[in-house]
C-alpha cells in the first residue's frame, strides 16, 4: 500500500515528491517510500483510516522481456519500471490492471495494438505474472501519422480521420479499406489492389511494417484534402470493379443529388448501365457521377467556363 494522500496533494507537496523522484532516479532507486512497509504496519494504517493506493512491487534487479510479433525481442530493466499503482484509494482500478483483468476474463490469446503501447506491455506482463495468468502474444502496429509526423487524431485533424468524411466524399468502402490495409502492411508483391478475400488470405503479422505510415494531405487545400494515393485507389476501383457492383453506389449518389429516375432500373436500364460503364473511366469519387456526370441525367446543368472558352468560343 502507498499511503501518500493523492487527493490532497498541495503544490508544495507535489513539487517535493517530484524532486524526490528525480533524486532517487539518479541513484537508481525507486520513488516509493512505502515499498518495504511490513504487512502488519500496512494493515494497521489502513484500518486506522489512512487513505492509500495499491501498488505492484516490481523487483529491483532483472528485466522483463517478450517477443513482439512485429518488432522482435523487447526488453526492459526492472529498475526502469516504477512500482505502478494498481488501485486508487477509492478502490477503482487503473488502466493497466483493468485491461489485464479484462483480457484474462475474455481468454484473449493475442493483443494487437499501436506501438505507442510498448511501454505499457512490460508493465502488463508483470501484472499477468503476479496474477499467475498466461501471458498472451503481443504484436504492436506502426502508427498512422500526419504530414508533420505527428499522430493523427480527431482532436487535431478533425474530419480527415472520420470514416463518414470519406463516405460522404464519395469513397467506396472496398477502396478505402484497401488503402488503409496498405498503410502499415504489405504482402510483398508488386500490386496494390486487393479484394477483402485476398486481404484475409494474404495477411500475416510478418508483413506488418515497423516504420510508421504517413497520410499526406494539405489542410485547407480542397484538391489535396486527403492522401492522393487514397483518391487514386478509389478511382481505380470505380474504373475496374464489376459494373453490377458499382451500380448500387451510383444509384445512391444520384438519389442523394435528386437525379435518379426509376426508368434507369427499368425501361432505360441498358442505357443507364452502358452510360455508367463509359463515363466511370474519368471519375475519382462517386460524387463525380452527380457533378461532372450531371449532364447525362439532367437537362439542368452548368457549363464549365474554362471549357466554354477553350472549345465553344473557337467556333462562333
Cite the ranges covered by each PLM segment.
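Active-site cores that bind ATP or allylic diphosphates and position pyrophosphate for catalysis
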Residues: 2-156, 162-163
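Catalytic adenosine-cofactor/nucleotide-binding cores of aminoacyl-tRNA synthetases and other
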Residues: 131-303
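Short, intrinsically disordered, charge-balanced linker/junction segments flanking boundaries
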Residues: 307-316
Amino acid at each position: 500500500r502507498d499511503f501518500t494522500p493523492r487527493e490532497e496533494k498541495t503544490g508544495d507537496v507535489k513539487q517535493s515528491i517530484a524532486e524526490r523522484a528525480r533524486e532517487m532516479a539518479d541513484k537508481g532507486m525507486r520513488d516509493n517510500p512505502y515499498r518495504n512497509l511490513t504487512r502488519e504496519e500496512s494493515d494497521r494504517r489502513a484500518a486506522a483510516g489512512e487513505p492509500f493506493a495499491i501498488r505492484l512491487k516490481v523487483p529491483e534487479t532483472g528485466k522483463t522481456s517478450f517477443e513482439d510479433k512485429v518488432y522482435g525481442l523487447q526488453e526492459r530493466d526492472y529498475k526502469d519500471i516504477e512500482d505502478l499503482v494498481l488501485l486508487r484509494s477509492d478502490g477503482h482500478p487503473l488502466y493497466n490492471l483493468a485491461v489485464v483483468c479484462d483480457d484474462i476474463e475474455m481468454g484473449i490469446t493475442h493483443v494487437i495494438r499501436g506501438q505507442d503501447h510498448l511501454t505499457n506491455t512490460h508493465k502488463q506482463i508483470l501484472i499477468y505474472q503476479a496474477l499467475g495468468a498466461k501471458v498472451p502474444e503481443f504484436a504492436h502496429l506502426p502508427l498512422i501519422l500526419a504530414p508533420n509526423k505527428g499522430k493523427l487524431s480527431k482532436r487535431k485533424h478533425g474530419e480527415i480521420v472520420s470514416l463518414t468524411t470519406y463516405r460522404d466524399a464519395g469513397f467506396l468502402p472496398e477502396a478505402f479499406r484497401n488503402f488503409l490495409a496498405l498503410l502499415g502492411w504489405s504482402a510483398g508483391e508488386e500490386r496494390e489492389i486487393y479484394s477483402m478475400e485476398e486481404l484475409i488470405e494474404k495477411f500475416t503479422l510478418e508483413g506488418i511494417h515497423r516504420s510508421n505510415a504517413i497520410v499526406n494531405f494539405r489542410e485547407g487545400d480542397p484538391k489535396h484534402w486527403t492522401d492522393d494515393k487514397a483518391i487514386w485507389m478509389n478511382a481505380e476501383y470505380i474504373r475496374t470493379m464489376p459494373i453490377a457492383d458499382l451500380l448500387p453506389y451510383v444509384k445512391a449518389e444520384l438519389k442523394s443529388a435528386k437525379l435518379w429516375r426509376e426508368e434507369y432500373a427499368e425501361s432505360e436500364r441498358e442505357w443507364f448501365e452502358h452510360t455508367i460503364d463509359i463515363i466511370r473511366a474519368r471519375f475519382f469519387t462517386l460524387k463525380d457521377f452527380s457533378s461532372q456526370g450531371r449532364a447525362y441525367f439532367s437537362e439542368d446543368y452548368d457549363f464549365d467556363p474554362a471549357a466554354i472558352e477553350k472549345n465553344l468560343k473557337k467556333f462562333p
